[in-house]
Design a protein with these regions (language model features):
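Residues at helix-coil transition
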Residues: 23, 31, 58-59, 96-100
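Short pre-active-site segment immediately N-terminal to redox-active cysteine/selenocysteine motifs
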Residues: 14, 22-25, 33, 37, ...
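Short, cysteine/histidine-rich loop/knuckle motifs that typically chelate Zn2+
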Residues: 28
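Sequence context of c-type cytochrome heme-c attachment sites
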Residues: 2-5, 31, 71-73, 80
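C-terminal capping alpha-helices of c-type cytochrome domains
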Residues: 51-56, 79-106
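Axial heme c-ligation environment in periplasmic c-type cytochrome domains
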Residues: 37-44, 61-91
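Gly/Gly-Pro-rich "capping" loops immediately C-terminal to redox-active cysteine motifs
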Residues: 15, 19, 31-62
């Protein structure tokens, strides 16, 4: 599991890659600004830690077994998050996209 992430200034190139990853791997179930099959992602950086987000992207099955917040999301949305088999660098790109989105839209 990801235990520590150091965040600096927003990396726009990394965020652009993350937007592409999100569109390809996540947008079937998630929208940024409203509920779909899964929860909206807007504001995620203020609701969850970067480590939590990375672990949920990388290993949603384990998170739903072990993490109370992930269990609560499953109970609310009734559909487990699919494991997209993303690498840690790909998950980091998505995290950066979330950071940029929240920074721009808040």
């Amino acid at each position: 599991p990801v235990t520590s992430i150091t965040l600096g200034d927003i990396d726009k190139a990394l965020a652009l890659e993350g937007e592409s990853q999100f569109t390809t791997k996540c947008a079937a179930c998630h929208k940024m600004d409203k509920r779909k099959i899964g929860p909206p992602m807007a504001g995620i950086m203020s609701r969850r830690s970067p480590e939590w987000i990375m672990n949920m992207i990388l290993n949603p099955d384990e998170m739903v077994k072990e993490n109370a917040q992930a269990k609560a999301l499953l109970a609310e949305y009734l559909s487990p998050m699919a494991n997209q088999s993303l690498t840690e660098p790909e998950a980091r790109q998505i995290l950066e996209y979330f950071r940029q989105y929240d920074n721009t839209n808040n």
